[in-house]
């Protein structure tokens, strides 16, 4: 299982760096590649609206993270921005703050459109937007597939300031003119590497064509391959770039281990051996296909292990219920695909198991970022057969890390 780029070619980290340097046109010793120097080490110094500040502090933020110190102000100034930082470092609050600061609350029309690749992530962003904008009186709506179009139309008719959605539903609403684009002045892509991949790229272009010509564009992600950066040139105007160097793209505080499994079919036994440890804390188990989610869930339950599962073939209502139970702690072990790896914030997760290694090095970061969010400690365990050795080597080279063999005292690590 070799490391493959999204276009199917062999993954080469050195080529990644060469391309990245060519695109950014600069190299330096700083953690961040950036062409914008202003850094604010407190929210108070950012000259935000008092009611937005109240919302930020009420949400539990005290001091801005590194990406927030650099990223909020240029967005608030109306500049196009490309921002990349690790999972769990506050990118969502960065662009939500930038959007909320610029809204004219007295004008109840859609002024900001935020797109995300999955329904769950879009709904989560909407919750953050509402929470931070609570004292401003912001009206936000999540428009995603798998929910009632009529309900979206009803809410949009009554007036909202911000729409957060998935590309398919948003394009449909724009086409029907249920969502009017006239007043939209901000356009944000979250998890932009995924949004600019082949699956979504055409839809993003179609949506962009329907927006006012002077719309501000913000592009955010935990990973930003050079291919995605090149695409952004087509619809961005001299963007402020804040990108973390690849060597910094490991997740501090997350201990990473592998378990050698001689045969694929023995992974199940290994997982069952670890189950008691899993249930001590909240754990997420990643596999590579929806079918395998169902298979592994059935196998675990047949052995009287309590697990829950979610993937893209389930209807939205079922997925919502499962995620609510997991967030509340009433379910402790969740089996899923990369669907969940994209930015879903479950604060209590401290253990991630890659039952299957991801098919691309970048997705490793998205997955293990479920544990140790906002600087907490976490553990990632990778099941590895002989076929996975190439990918594990690619991952270690890509993030400049050493993944060690799992010690016997795994419970002590949690």
Curated annotation (Swiss-Prot):
Q: Where is this motif: DEAD box?
A: 190-193
Positions of ATP binding: 85-92
Q: Does the keyword Acetylation apply?
A: yes
Family matches, as SUPFAM superfamilies = P-loop containing nucleoside triphosphate hydrolases (SSF52540)
Q: Which InterPro entries match?
A: DEAD/DEAH_box_helicase_dom (IPR011545), Helicase_ATP-bd (IPR014001), Helicase_C-like (IPR001650), P-loop_NTPase (IPR027417), RNA-helicase_DEAD-box_CS (IPR000629), RNA_helicase_DEAD_Q_motif (IPR014014)
Specify the Helicase C-terminal domain's residue ranges: 253-414
Subcellular location as annotated: Cytoplasm
Give an example GO cellular component term for this record. Answer: plant-type cell wall
Q: What is known of its domains?
A: The Q motif is unique to and characteristic of the DEAD box family of RNA helicases and controls ATP binding and hydrolysis.
Spell out the family assignment given in the record's similarity comment: Belongs to the DEAD box helicase family. eIF4A subfamily.
Protein's name in the database: Eukaryotic initiation factor 4A-3
